[in-house]
Swiss-Prot record:
Protein name in UniProt: Secretory carrier-associated membrane protein 4
Physiological role: Probably involved in membrane protein trafficking.
Source species: Rattus norvegicus (Rat)
Modified residues (Phosphothreonine): T194
InterPro entries: SCAMP
UniProt gene name: Scamp4
Lineage: Eukaryota, Metazoa, Chordata, Craniata, Vertebrata
């Protein structure tokens, strides 16, 4: 955003890379939605942590006799979904609440819904998906109890992520419908191109109100020289 230096992700100063986004909940998100947006952010962090724990569990699975492909896929999920989930569903949610953007709400519902389905699949734990879910964990207890106990941790974390994602979708949808959001508004934003970087609500208000009145209204003055009452 103009006049604001990007601050996320926070990177060490010695790296040649610079932060890609500006993120400040107290500055950009309306007070009534700050708690919810922060919870969505924490959900993203929890899901990324789950992917990291899943990678360790898949390594234990592999060492105990499981397929090495699961470890490879777990590494791919961690590297791929950590940045993509932030860009593809957290940022739309952030921009949606920042500017009451119907297009970003729609993008959030679509992508976050797909993320929810994927997380449910990861929690179930189908063989060959690179996720230590319930089926993979329970089935491996007969082979290695120690590895299965490690695998149980991401199974629980994937399940918690899926539950919180479902609750989040319901809460965000209620707010969206209550604020009068619609597909027509999303199409209008798409046509105008404002979906890319919608202005904050404060900026929209300032643009709408403008300088309609001078800071100090002037009172008309009338010359009294030569004027007499009859």
């Amino acid at each position: 955003m103009a006049g604001k230096e990007n601050n996320f992700p926070p990177l060490p100063h010695f790296l040649p890379l610079k932060p890609c986004f500006y993120q400040d909940f107290s500055d950009e998100i309306p007070v009534e939605h700050q708690v919810l947006v922060k919870r969505i952010y924490r959900l993203w962090m929890f899901y990324c942590t789950t992917l990291g724990v899943n990678l360790v569990a898949c390594l234990a699975w592999w060492i105990a006799g499981g397929a090495g492909a699961n470890f490879g896929l777990a590494m791919l999920w961690l590297v791929l979904f950590t940045p993509c989930s932030y860009v593809c569903w957290f940022r739309p949610a952030y921009k949606a609440f920042r500017a009451d953007s119907s297009f970003n709400f729609m993008a959030f519902f679509f992508i976050f819904g797909a993320q929810f389905v994927l997380t449910v699949i990861q929690a179930i734990g189908f063989s060959g998906w690179g996720a230590c879910g319930w089926l993979a964990t329970i089935g491996f207890f007969g082979t290695s109890v120690g590895a299965a106990v490690v695998m149980l941790i991401p199974a629980i974390m994937f399940s918690l992520s899926a539950v919180v994602m479902a609750i989040t979708i319901v809460k965000v949808h209620r707010i969206y419908r209550g604020a009068g959001g619609s597909l027509q508004k999303a199409q209008t934003e798409w046509s105008a191109g404002t979906w890319r970087n919608p202005p904050s609500r404060e900026a929209q208000f300032n643009s709408f109100s403008g300088n309609s009145l001078p800071e100090y209204p002037t009172v008309p003055s009338y010359s009294t020289s030569g004027s007499q009452w009859p």
